[in-house]
Amino acid sequence: MTPEDPEETQPLLGPPGGSAPRGRRVFLAAFAAALGPLSFGFALGYSSPAIPSLQRAAPPAPRLDDAAASWFGAVVTLGAAAGGVLGGWLVDRAGRKLSLLLCSVPFVAGFAVITAAQDVWMLLGGRLLTGLACGVASLVAPVYISEIAYPAVRGLLGSCVQLMVVVGILLAYLAGWVLEWRWLAVLGCVPPSLMLLLMCFMPETPRFLLTQHRRQEAMAALRFLWGSEQGWEDPPIGAEQSFHLALLRQPGIYKPFIIGVSLMAFQQLSGVNAVMFYAETIFEEAKFKDSSLASVVVGVIQVLFTAVAALIMDRAGRRLLLVLSGVVMVFSTSAFGAYFKLTQGGPGNSSHVAISAPVSAQPVDASVGLAWLAVGSMCLFIAGFAVGWGPIPWLLMSEIFPLHVKGVATGICVLTNWLMAFLVTKEFSSLMEVLRPYGAFWLASAFCIFSVLFTLFCVPETKGKTLEQITAHFEGR
């Protein structure tokens, strides 16, 4: 396919009769697909309540030491990186629907292995399986939803991917208060099982069916989702061709590729994992009686502001929310760094984060007051992240790539995201030893500044455009 082929940019699926579709089943199909991200969020949140329980476990139950606990949390990201590659292969060969059905299997199998675990290796194996499923779901669900949605609601439905992730995390936190780790793993089997059931009754995306020359099935899917088959075009010439490196010379390919990979990298370099790492300790410093409340507070803020983002996404647009989100994160990470500078800035202090003890020169009341600065900065950061840099990179990833490279390109984006998440999580402590905690957060603030500049100069607005119009923009048409 070359940029000179006009058929590539013709709309596959336009609004029926020139007006917005009125089909409601598209919301049901999006909900069914979004149960994958809900399962993904539950798997991410599972480690927070499960690790303390597993560290206290008495024989014959498996027990985690500090090293095993670290891997129990981190191995999911490695599995997800592999899942991103697998998902990129599956989504173009098996289709979007079948890929979602298949990813429910390692979700259920992984949680089942954890439930039956008799040793640490079974626990890690179960987490690796759920991580693999997370990687597939994080790629396929946004692609499926973006391809079934009409432009007027694509931002809303696409943002629901991240909304369901944070709902899943919050669900794991709340359930962890009343369920021990085995029963919590049993609960983790419910969302993917429900997804498997519902997706059996949902259609494949019309765009994928068109590229496979399955016209009648595409028309039936369109009627099911949108309530109409009007506004339909033949599949673009070349949309079924496979990816090869020579395509990277085309602006319609390399421009969205650079944007997609950069967005995923900036998301992880924003400092979000560092803020989450410190949440409970900061709440302890602010004299909260139950520091585990921090996880729930963080989860509630994420859900509320991701929901706000979903509601305003198709009005405010992607670029504006990314810029506002980045600016909020710049100020909040800078304030975080100032907190650490004030409490640990003395030359005699360890550079390795023991923030649970205030600096001796600080009175207790002053220490508590500074801790409230950190609590406010943390809540502001989480709200800012949830409004923009949480959901939008995943949404844009599903929008900006042409059909014939979508599987490979989104797979590389997901691989980038999960590898960056693993590296940032595992190496953050080492970074703080070199730069001190305040330096690490100020570095995150600098990355947030770069993310704002990158958005302003490189990221186009996709609000209200068809996927084919977005492709035409990158090709300079």
UniProtKB/Swiss-Prot annotation:
Keywords: Cell membrane, Cytoplasmic vesicle, Glycoprotein, Membrane, Sugar transport, Transmembrane, Transmembrane helix, Transport
Catalytic reaction equation(s): D-glucose(out) = D-glucose(in); D-fructose(out) = D-fructose(in); L-dehydroascorbate(out) = L-dehydroascorbate(in); alpha,alpha-trehalose(in) = alpha,alpha-trehalose(out)
Tissue: Highly expressed in testis, but not in testicular carcinoma. Lower amounts present in most other tissues.
CC terms in the record's Gene Ontology section: clathrin-coated endocytic vesicle membrane; lysosomal membrane; membrane; plasma membrane; synaptic vesicle
Intracellular or extracellular location(s): Cell membrane; Cytoplasmic vesicle membrane
Motif Dileucine internalization motif: positions: 12-13
Cross-referenced Pfam families: Sugar_tr
Positions on the Cytoplasmic side per record topology: 1-25, 92-96, 149-156, 204-256, 314-319, 389-404, 460-477
Induction: In testis, down-regulated by estrogen.
Membrane topology type: Multi-pass membrane protein
Entry GO MF terms: D-glucose binding; D-glucose transmembrane transporter activity; dehydroascorbic acid transmembrane transporter activity; fructose transmembrane transporter activity
GO annotation terms (biological process): carbohydrate metabolic process; D-glucose transmembrane transport; dehydroascorbic acid transport; fructose transmembrane transport; hexose transmembrane transport; insulin receptor signaling pathway; male meiosis I; response to hypoxia
The keyword DNA damage is assigned to this record: no
Chief location: membrane
Segments passing through the bilayer: 26-46, 71-91, 97-117, 128-148, 157-177, 183-203, 257-277, 293-313, 320-340, 368-388, 405-425, 439-459
List of glycosylated residues: N349
Activity regulation statement: Inhibited by cytochalasin B.
InterPro entries xrefs: MFS_dom (IPR020846), MFS_sugar_transport-like (IPR005828), MFS_trans_sf (IPR036259), MFS_Trehalose_Transporter (IPR050549), Sugar/inositol_transpt (IPR003663), Sugar_transporter_CS (IPR005829)
Binding of D-glucose, residues: Q162, Q267, Q268, N273, W394
Family assignment from sequence similarity: Belongs to the major facilitator superfamily. Sugar transporter (TC 2.A.1.1) family. Glucose transporter subfamily.
Subunit structure: Interacts with AP2B1.
Function of the protein: Insulin-regulated facilitative hexose transporter that mediates the transport of glucose and fructose. Facilitates hepatic influx of dietary trehalose, which in turn inhibits glucose and fructose influx triggering a starvation signal and hepatic autophagy through activation of AMPK and ULK1. Also able to mediate the transport of dehydroascorbate.
The protein, known as: Solute carrier family 2, facilitated glucose transporter member 8
UniProt source species: Homo sapiens
Gene, per the UniProt record: SLC2A8
